[in-house]
UniProtKB/Swiss-Prot annotation:
Pathway participation: Amino-acid biosynthesis; L-arginine biosynthesis; L-arginine from L-ornithine and carbamoyl phosphate: step 3/3
Gene Ontology biological process: arginine biosynthetic process via ornithine; L-arginine biosynthetic process
Top-level taxon of origin: Bacteria
CDD domains, per the entry: Argininosuccinate_lyase
Family: Belongs to the lyase 1 family. Argininosuccinate lyase subfamily.
Lineage of origin: Bacteria, Pseudomonadati, Pseudomonadota, Gammaproteobacteria, Chromatiales
InterPro entries per record: Arg_succ_lyase_C, Argininosuccinate_lyase, Fumarase/histidase_N, Fumarate_lyase_CS, Fumarate_lyase_fam, Fumarate_lyase_N, L-Aspartase-like
Protein name: Argininosuccinate lyase
Primary location recorded for the protein, binned into one broad class: cytoplasm
The keyword Lyase appears for this protein: yes
Amino acid sequence: MSTQHSGDKLWGGRFSEPTDAFVEAFTASVSFDQRLYRHDIQGSKAHARMLARVGVLTEEECDKIHDGLDAILADIERGDFAWSVELEDVHMNVEARLIERIGDVGKKLHTGRSRNDQVATDIRLYLREAIDALMQEIRRLQGGLVDLAEREAQTIMPGFTHLQTAQPVTFGHHMMAWYEMLERDHGRLADCRKRVNVLPLGAAALAGTPYPLDRHYTAELLGFDAVTDNSLDAVSDRDFAIEFCAAGALIMTHLSRFSEELILWASAQFGFVDLPDRFCTGSSIMPQKKNPDVPELVRGKTGRANGNLIALLTLMKGQPLAYNKDNQEDKEPLFDTVDTLAGSLRAFADMVPHIQVRAEVMRAAASRGFATATDLADYLVRRGMPFRDAHEVVGRAVRHGVETGKDLAEMSLDELRKFSKTIEQDVFEVLTLEGSVAARNVHGGTAPAQVRARIRAARAKLMPAKG
């Protein structure tokens, strides 16, 4: 049975009875938005400094507010701050404690602002900081991939399409593919950050404020590149959070695909790589097991990131302007995506440099499955045969190989000439794995020379991050 909770609200003047206790708990967000305490205090200090600049506060009042906020920050970080559900959210908790500490001067802090523009500012400050940290983790992971690619620039493995052997590639080339995907992920976060880094503070509830606020000065204090140009838009939209979650879902999708490969490659059926013991776990019943828990969890956590994106899109799709209480539900999906990305990127950045490659196993796998069939077709084309005819000839040679249990390089010259008289002894030069990868010496190709060129370019890009 619901009860009513008495207690003063900072907005309580309009109401004739206290809030129902269940409703109070149901509508409170402090259990999760307290994460924003540093950003809330940072924004409040800048707001107070701006109010002093325009004459709404005296310098003495501003200093008193700053001292009070600094003391509250210290209390929170020591664990000495009692968060109150009755005060609903991080903003009201901090403001109430400020008034308790410094008296009526604290009541002036909220002049010219609303919780609507306040929370939008807090989220942007938080997300900007999170993006910067995530971009650094991406760079760290990319650095590990580049090191691994350089170490294995000439290591031959089977390249796959449809999870069937397709053509030989180098392991270094394969690692650089993941580098390139992460490079686009890094770029998407950098681009998203531009739209995050716009200040909504000063939009107030929805219509702006009659006070002579200097929004550009506040933006300068907080490191924002610009201020919002429409007060309704400033407080009501969360497209910047949706954009971040979309970029996050793509990052997790890339990590999930990479995870799937590592899980397969580490299995006894592939045996291509060995993952470090410290990134794996065992079985409670099967003593032989070494389970790739880190990539499996990253693969699984991708569902969270995808779900958070859909949650935010669904949250926003039916809202009229301007702010609605629905937007309280924006934080948990956003926070969860940040946490999921941070943990997954850290796990991969820590693990990748220590992956052990079983080069001989990969080479043996590449020598099976007719991986050089395309090379034979190209050989025939260079001797004047139309490609479609060459494709047909090689297809028949492959069928013969399947029937006899021989790979193309294992067939005799006489056997190969049964399919085309244009085949000569030099064909065996193109049917080697080394010859196949070396022939792909086009920009972006798998030839070791091209892989090393991409590694040099990547290192040049990563160098500022390492400096």
